[in-house]
Each structure stands twice: as structure tokens, then as C-alpha cells.
Amino acid sequence: MRHLRNIFNLGIKELRSLLGDKAMLTLIVFSFTVSVYSSATVTPGSLNLAPIAIADMDQSQLSNRIVNSFYRPWFLPPEMITADEMDAGLDAGRYTFAINIPPNFQRDVLAGRQPDIQVNVDATRMSQAFTGNGYIQNIINGEVNSFVARYRDNSEPLVSLETRMRFNPNLDPAWFGGVMAIINNITMLAIVLTGSALIREREHGTVEHLLVMPITPFEIMMVKIWSMGLVVLVVSGLSLVLMVKGVLGVPIEGSIPLFMLGVALSLFATTSIGIFMGTIARSMPQLGLLVILVLLPLQMLSGGSTPRESMPQMVQDIMLTMPTTHFVSLAQAILYRGAGFEIVWSQFLTLMAIGGAFFTIALLRFRKTIGTMA
């Protein structure tokens, strides 16, 4: 009981110390409010109001149909230009896409000559160029096919394709961006808060107090883990309910308590990583550099930004030893697909094992270095 009382009382002290750190409080509030909202809304996953110019050298019924097929919200109203103005407009950055419809285009299409339409893309606008190129191809092909169908006898297709989008029927990027922002910020804050809590002990000269107190390194670690983990657990739950469900209107298909249990297991592992990094860094700037080196690979390679199946096999195997990979997997399964414990139990078990391993490594490192931190 004495050990539990020490862990509880020192944890309350950590929470009070955090309340006096305005910079950390600002980071916490920003990460789970403004950051979540901006990740869901500022960067669209689909084409949105792309500037486009068209040089219509044919002036036919078909070319007019193509011109009129580009409209909001995917494109701005097309600007009609001449072929000579096309290069200058692209060089000046006025258009992302410039289309050149050649003379006699409709006549050649009806004659079956397969004429070419030139589509120029400003590839420096990466957020629009790749997606927009596919949009334009589909739009032009659709207009040409429907126009030609009126002049030719086309048989009905043998197969009718019905596409149904599961879990996100409207392909709304906000549904994905908001939840992934919370998942990434949970990992970031867990590492930053526990690492900075250890650095604060050194900077404030309170390590000597810990050394003379009747507490063990294990108890000190547990203090950092439960106090900082509780903060992240509470604010992430509030952000999920208030920001994602409330402000963004994203439907949560699965059990929020089950997801929060997964958050707790992930925090056990990531807070241990934070303590390990806190024993290596000698100051807050050093901790910040270490966080950048560790956090970016964890977020980019965990399967949240890019499907793991698209990565090299060696990277997939290495990332299986990281807690974020399994946390992202269970979070997406629960929140997006409504998975129950019978589906995600293996990720829970793996997180427990990885958390235990990281905790043991951090504890050994902490025991070895606590005497030199004073």
C-alpha cells in the first residue's frame, strides 16, 4: 500500500506541475482542437476548385459539351484562352490544368480517327495535379462516349457494375483526417509529456529530492506514466466526442470505451518510449530533436498515412515491433468499421507485449542513469 500511495501522491504532484506549465497546456489544447479540425478540413483529399483553362480550337457541339462539363466544386469555371496563351498562363501559375481541343475534333471523333486532346498539368501543385489528371480523363472520355453513342448503335453492356463505398459512402476526407489527427497526437503527446516531465526534474533540481526519498526507480516511472498518460487519455476522449463527433460530424461506428482501452495500452508503450528518450536528452531542445527523429517514422510508417501493404517488406516487418502500427490498426477497425473485441483482441495482446518490452528497457536505462541526472 505504501508503494501505491507514493505513486498516487507523486502523480498528483506531476499533474500540478503540468498545470503550471503554460507552454505544455497550450500544446495539449492546440493538438486536440485546432490541429484536429485543420487536419480534417484544411487539406482536402479530393480535387477542390482547381483553376483550369481551355483552348477550344474546334468550336463544335462536342467541344462545348466538354467545356461545360468542368464545374464546381471540383473546378473553377474554365477560362477560355487561345493556344498561344496556354504556355504563358502555366508559366505564370494562373492555371493548374490547360486543355487544348484541336480543330475538327468532333468530325474526327465521328469518323473514328481517334484524335488527341492535349492536357497540360502544372505538376508543382501536387495536391491537385495527380488527382485532377484522372478527373479530367474520366470527364472527357465520358462526354465523348455519351456523344458518340447518339450517332452509333451501341449494344447494351453485358455486365453492370455497381460500386458501393463502405464505411465512408461520400468519400469525405474529414472522416479520415480528424480521427488520424487524434491518433497521431496521442503518440506525440505521450512521448513529449513524459520526456519533458523527466527533463523538468533535472532543470528544476528536484532529482536530488527523488534520490533521498524512499521510492524506487520503478515507482518514479509509474508516476510519470500514469499521470501523463491520464492527461492524454482524457483529452483524446474529449476531442473524439466533442471535435470529431460534435464539430466535424463524423459518425463513430464502434465502441468508444473499447477504443479508449486501446489508447491506454498504446500510452503504456509510448510513455515508456518518452521516459527512455528523457534519460538520453540533457535538455528540452535535445528532447525536441529526438522526438522529431522518432515521431516522424512512427507516424509515416505505421499505416495511417500510407497502407502498410504498399511499403517494402522489410519496413513492414520492422514496424510490427512498434506500438503505433498496432494502435492505428485497432483504432481504424473500431472507429471506422465498428469492430468488436473479438476482432481486435490480437492487437490488444500485441500492444501489451510491446508495452511491457519498452517499459522494461526504459526501466533498465532509468535505473542506470538516474544517479547521473542530478
Spans of features found by a protein language model:
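Junction motif at the cytosolic side of a transmembrane helix
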Residues: R2, A197, F276, L335, ...
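Transmembrane helix segments
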Residues: Y37-L47, A281-T321
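Alpha-helical transmembrane segments and their short interhelical loops
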Residues: T33-V36, P217-V291, L296-Q299, E342-F348, ...
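Membrane-interfacial helix-loop-helix junctions in multi-pass membrane proteins
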Residues: D84, F167-L171, P251, S302-F358
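Short, membrane-interfacial amphipathic segments enriched in basic
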Residues: M1-G11, L76, M314-T325, A374
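Extracytoplasmic/periplasmic domains immediately adjacent to an N-terminal transmembrane anchor
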Residues: M1-W175, I343, K368
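Transmembrane helix boundary and interhelical loop/hinge segments in multi-pass membrane proteins
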Residues: I191-M213, I225, I370
